[in-house]
């Protein structure tokens, strides 16, 4: 059946066989969707469980999660660089280089994870003070404890991300999904036991994360070294300057872009934190629910890297454009369904959390802003640039993201949140303005075709 589909569609590409069938795309996107759904669901469970420990605890965890997200994007950016390079080599049918680059990704991820973990463990308190200034003492203590414990998991998380990126590059996201299911079961069961049975606080949320990430890293690395996969990871890995440079050539601009993006988010949350615990808690709950609305877009964005990377490596710009449009359409349809559902059942969803009436009302308003705007703007703002990254057009995406964050999101957040006193609502309106700028720039870049000149075999 798959062969028949490929033959029928071949004339669309001048008689060339499509690099991906409909079934290939579904096999890639489906497990990624499940994996993203699990991640967000467990994040919601974490927030709900820790909310039972009081609003100081939920505020401390939410503030540190912004820092954790900043760290995680470093690992994700490196994994993205590796996935792009491996996908391009596979598309060009250069198996030897694809194998070598997979080993370099694992080595670089391990080094980065250990370095960042030690740094955050030692400097947890000054990091939180630097990011958020004067916050309540109980919120600070909860945040320091949570950051130090989660820092222990960074090396495991970095290596898991590397392994998952390699399997995505092979078009096999099912393996990372299976391991993710186990990881999230360990996490959520551990949280329940630690908080409800043992009576622990924020440490009861943090330690299960460490355990689950350690198990996931061991399992996925074990699968990477098994035979029978499209890639053969070298058993002995030494740093290869040329190959590492190629991976970092994609990873560093992506890391810089995403790190500054997360740093910008931390800055705007620091503005919100000056308005008190109600605004911090409402912002935390809204962020968790909005993460649910972005699940399909994030999954398709990851698939975009593999698909476009393979097309670019094969030197087929026509298929690159075709699959970019196809996946972007999938993102709009799926995000419409998810965000529509969130808006429809918004009050019951927010009601799950143990919030005061004032906090609940604000959280509902923030989700309405995000979900209503995300229907139209999020896919082109965050899924489309992954196609540009996979074509090595990373500097453009970096410049647009950084400038848009600095000028629109930070600038208007200060104006609306601080100067006009709108609080969290002002920050979220500024976020929508940032999205509009990103959409205009990324759509124009894709249509211009300038990305076609960035890849060199």
Please provide the spans of the model-predicted regions.
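Small-residue-rich hydrophobic transmembrane alpha-helices
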Residues: 58-118, 157-176, 269, 280-346, ...
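Short runs within selected transmembrane alpha-helices of multi-pass transporters and secretion channels
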Residues: 79, 149-168, 176-187, 205-220, ...
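Alpha-helical transmembrane segments of multipass membrane proteins
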Residues: 44-48, 162-166, 185-193, 221, ...
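N-terminal transmembrane alpha-helices
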Residues: 16-48, 52-53, 69-81, 85, ...
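Transmembrane helical elements of multi-pass membrane transporters/channels
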Residues: 27-46, 149, 183, 212-216, ...
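Helix-terminus/linker motif at the lipid-water interface of multi-pass membrane proteins
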Residues: 37-59, 128-137, 193-200, 259-292, ...
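Interfacial/gating helices of multi-pass transporter permease domains
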Residues: 50-69, 137-142, 202-203, 243-250, ...
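Short alpha-helical transmembrane segments in multi-pass integral membrane proteins
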Residues: 1-32, 86-153, 195-252, 308-374, ...
